Curated annotation (Swiss-Prot):
Its EC number is 2.1.2.3, 3.5.4.10. GO terms for cellular component: cytosol. Pfam families: AICARFT_IMPCHas, MGS. Residues 1-148 form the MGS-like domain. The IMP cyclohydrolase activity resides in the N-terminal region. One of its GO terms (molecular function) is IMP cyclohydrolase activity. This is Bifunctional purine biosynthesis protein PurH. Belongs to the PurH family.
Length: 529
């Protein structure tokens, strides 16, 4: 259906005024009558545009501090009236058709994000008339266009010019979908906010009393369909949050290479989030969502060389993340040394990109620089439900550590311990990481017993000819028995960092003392499943 509808009358009422003067000017220049409300009407009038206040159009004033202004039959009749079917009743009541509605809603999300937001503030930023107009126009998209995003303004003007002042049905239908998505997201935010107040339990509704609402409403936007999911028999798509502020795989720009696969995205996320932990030039190589090599150094090339040496076998076909601009020297080393699926960095130099162009199958992403890790929620789907928790942003510094062994760690052991502790946070549990001189020596991931993760880390190091003696070992959770310490001592580990908290901590500490190992407690666990 390509049926066009001429646009002769527009109703504009926006909280976000970005681009509205330019858009309204373009509409007016094309002979379209402008109706508007409150602050939007004043803004347009001040810009010299011919605009009719809705209260003048309806003959009914705004009241109750603006709570009631567009809830009137002349407004909604003009929007909902079916052309060719309701013309008679519209004429009888002097209702003029409204052909395009331009509305965005009160800034509820921004309001409740303020630390000083009260319940009264939140309530006053719940839009009533706006969503009603949006839904009315979207319902009647056969005859009316609804615009909720300023990013659509240029395309609408261009189409009006291409179609003699009309908009096509596909455009109106697409705009209606955006409108329903917009109101659904808006109502979800309100429901989530009120659901977190839980007044029945706390008796204080001035501030949210819980992190998690009674009903969880989520809104994500589809970024791409995927060829398949984790396996080829599974269909899949990638959805992203609407306004992601933090540098992430969701917001990254792909400079070259094939479309990202489901597994590419999952692994790239794991690599990028791990490399964000480090302030020094760092490289993280990931395979199947587990780091297989991590290092920091004075240069990106040195960091990559060290990370690669941890486990060259696993690095084949892996994902590489950096926390600095990718330079030509490092790019050259990568493509001459290994097959890589994805490279992600804050930026890529022109020279590096020219070198990578010789390997067009390599997916190259830039994510921009990051400042701080944003708080958010993690989700895990279970059959029939969803587990929700805060993101694991827990960190420890040297000041947080407790040395529980007889021997104190050396300065180098302490640096290595803090380094491998950061890595262990991103290794699947049970996680054991060996590190020395700011590089991983061996990584044991995902084993059902902690001692076997420790043994695997030692085997990995031995296979690559890496010297374990004098290395630090990190464990993402406490050691339930001394066997993990005995295994570490057997390969030359001299410092262990772990959360502590086992009922057998005394036995584990005693084992460390027997072997002359310095043991550090963090009092923070980092399970990752």
């Amino acid at each position: 259906m390509q049926q066009r509808r001429p646009i002769r009358r527009a109703l504009l009422s926006v909280s976000d005024k970005a681009g509205i003067i330019e858009f309204a000017t373009a509409l007016s220049q094309r002979g379209i009558e402008l109706l508007s409300t409150g602050g939007t009407a004043r803004l347009l009038a001040d810009a010299g545009l011919p605009v009719t206040e809705v209260s003048d159009y309806t003959g009914f004033p705004e009241m109750m501090d603006g709570r009631v202004k567009t809830l009137h039959p002349k407004v909604h009749g003009g929007i909902l009236g079916r052309r060719g079917q309701d013309d008679g009743i519209m004429a009888q009541h002097d209702i003029q058709p409204i052909d395009i509605v331009v509305v965005n809603l009160y800034p509820f999300a921004q309001t409740v994000a303020r630390p000083d937001c009260s319940l009264e503030d939140a309530v006053e930023n719940i839009d009533i008339g706006g969503p009603t107009m949006v839904r009315s126009a979207a319902k009647n998209h056969k005859d009316v266009a609804i615009v909720v995003k300023s990013s659509d303004y240029p395309a609408i003007i261009a189409e009006l010019d291409e179609n003699d002042g009309s908009l096509t049905y596909p455009t109106r239908f697409n705009l209606a979908i955006k409108a329903f998505e917009h109101t659904a997201a808006y109502d979800s935010m309100i429901a989530n906010y009120f659901g977190a107040l839980v007044p029945a339990y706390h008796g204080d509704t001035e501030q949210p009393s819980g992190r998690f609402p009674r009903t969880l409403n989520l809104n994500y936007i589809k970024k791409q369909d995927m060829r398949y999911g984790e396996n080829s028999h599974q269909q899949a798509a990638f959805y992203i949050e609407e306004d992601v502020k933090e540098a992430s795989v969701a917001t990254a720009l792909q400079l070259q290479g094939k479309a990202l696969s489901y597994n590419n995205i999952a692994d790239t996320d794991a690599a990028l989030e791990c490399v964000k932990e480090f302030s020094e030039p760092a490289c993280v190589i990931v395979k199947h969502a587990n780091p297989c090599g991590v290092a920091i150094a004075d240069s990106l090339l040195a960091a990559y060389d060290k990370a690669y040496k941890t486990d060259p076998t696993s690095a084949f076909g892996g994902i590489i993340a950096f926390n600095r601009e990718l330079d030509a020297e490092t790019a050259s080393a990568i493509i001459s040394r290994q097959f890589v699926e994805v490279i992600i960095a804050p930026s890529v130099s022109t020279e590096a990109l020219a070198l990578l162009a010789a390997k067009q199958n390599v997916r190259v992403l830039t994510c921009g620089q990051w400042q701080e890790r944003s708080a958010g929620l993690d989700f895990k789907r279970v059959n029939g439900g969803l587990l929700v928790q805060d993101r694991d942003l827990g960190m420890v510094t040297e000041a947080d550590l407790r040395v529980v062994s007889q021997r104190q760690p050396t300065e180098q052991e302490l640096r290595d311990a803090l380094f491998c502790w950061k890595v262990a946070k991103f290794v699947k549990s049970n996680a054991i990481v060996y590190a020395r001189d700011n590089m991983t020596i061996g990584i044991g991931a995902g084993q059902m017993s902690r001692v076997y993760s420790a043994k695997i880390a030692g085997i990995k190091a031995a296979d690559e000819g890496l010297e374990v003696a004098g290395s630090a070992m990190a464990s993402d959770a406490f050691f339930p028995f001394r066997d993990g310490i005995d295994a570490a001592a057997a390969v030359g580990i001299t410092c262990v960092i772990q959360p502590g908290g086992s009922i057998r901590d005394d036995e584990v500490i005693a084992a460390a003392d027997e072997h002359g190992i310095a043991m550090i407690f963090t009092d923070m666990r980092h399970f990752r499943h």
